[in-house]
């Protein structure tokens, strides 16, 4: 049996920067199955050797953000020795900026993630997105920077989490014909509500993949075109009733949709595209 490919995210801090870059790059390959394993706080030679030993056991790419020069050089030596592919995320950037400014970097792992007010705002936003995901508690709509509405599998949750990592508090609500709309939705200023629209064909494809993943029958009503059209018609009626802007997410990446959401809520305007 061929071993599953894996990416080791290695850092002498928390590893978030390397993890985000890795996931952004992986998105170019769609749904390919690649495991990501994060190894934070690798700041001594022994810990580093343990990571390398694990990487040698299977097809592995090492992606790393190592600030301390001695640890970075040792990692480079080990991956060269064992012929393990590796990508240095921070090294070339640090060297380039150092040459530009004519001054060395401060060499403080985790400096970018210091526990300042900005960091805590992001944590708070992520917790908010989790708590008010999928319409769990509509009371959160009134505290949100944005409320995303749309049918199931229209990328509401991924966009909410993406914006949360940029310190925006985002709630979302699935639109289901059989479920009444919460009164709180109509108390939110319309420019803070954003509808997510997706084509029937794309939604059918996404839902077919979803039911395969969770083991439902392929003829489940959830992915039938008749049901999809019914839900999309209902969603359009809700968009009009609320008076919100609408984004067509059919061919948009999560990042693109998030940018459009910010344009809408920051300008305070209602318009569709």
UniProtKB/Swiss-Prot annotation:
Gene Ontology molecular function: ADP binding; ATP binding; phosphotransferase activity, phosphate group as acceptor; protein serine/threonine kinase activity
The enzyme's E.C. designation: 2.7.11.32, 2.7.4.27
Keyword line: Kinase, Nucleotide-binding, Serine/threonine-protein kinase, Transferase
Chain residues that bind ADP: 150-157
Record InterPro entries: Kinase-pyrophosphorylase, PPDK_reg
Function per UniProt: Bifunctional serine/threonine kinase and phosphorylase involved in the regulation of the pyruvate, phosphate dikinase (PPDK) by catalyzing its phosphorylation/dephosphorylation.
Top-level taxon of the source organism: Bacteria
Enzyme class name: transferase
Catalyzed reactions: N(tele)-phospho-L-histidyl/L-threonyl-[pyruvate, phosphate dikinase] + ADP = N(tele)-phospho-L-histidyl/O-phospho-L-threonyl-[pyruvate, phosphate dikinase] + AMP + H(+); N(tele)-phospho-L-histidyl/O-phospho-L-threonyl-[pyruvate, phosphate dikinase] + phosphate + H(+) = N(tele)-phospho-L-histidyl/L-threonyl-[pyruvate, phosphate dikinase] + diphosphate
Protein name, UniProt field: Putative pyruvate, phosphate dikinase regulatory protein
Family: Belongs to the pyruvate, phosphate/water dikinase regulatory protein family. PDRP subfamily.
